[in-house]
């Protein structure tokens, strides 16, 4: 389907929600810590898998190694700014074509791109708190701390406000995401599959008939989408944004002619 046709669907929509998957991270240059060579390198370097280290049990029992891994493998990549996929999604929000974004990714790329209505299901590395008194800390505080970051007030550990493996996702956040999807007449699934965890958990709440899937990986569940685009997400969103900008310029030109 042409970008102009997708744009028309978005322009006719009263409420569109975007669900953003891991492919958008990869397109942005972020590593897949549980994939292929990267996963192997992590096990060789730390003696454990990323999933083991980023668990509630590991955090409770091996904080020193947890934070060594966390600073190097989770915080270092944040030096990479949001790429054109996230920037163009923010533009669609700004144009009133997308009303909310939902992701399970932890790097805050939607917020950093300027999206005002992002729901970070599993939290963000940019939010941290003292496990004892609740005092909040920046990501920079975690990064600059030697070893285990400690609260300036009570000297207890400061931990990232993210959902570790073995922890339950905050029920309030799940409810908020479900409510957004229930309101949607268009669901824009970007860079993930309908079988993946993000969709599997939330897609049951969508009651519309305009599910648009943009992905670069084929899967048999793709047939459940009403509109299917095999493409990089950043390329697809860029085309939609350009189509909208072209449409607006043409409209402004016609209005100018009408006033002459």
Regions found by a protein language model. Give the residues of each.
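Conserved catalytic core of sirtuin-type NAD+-dependent deacylases
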Residues: 1-260
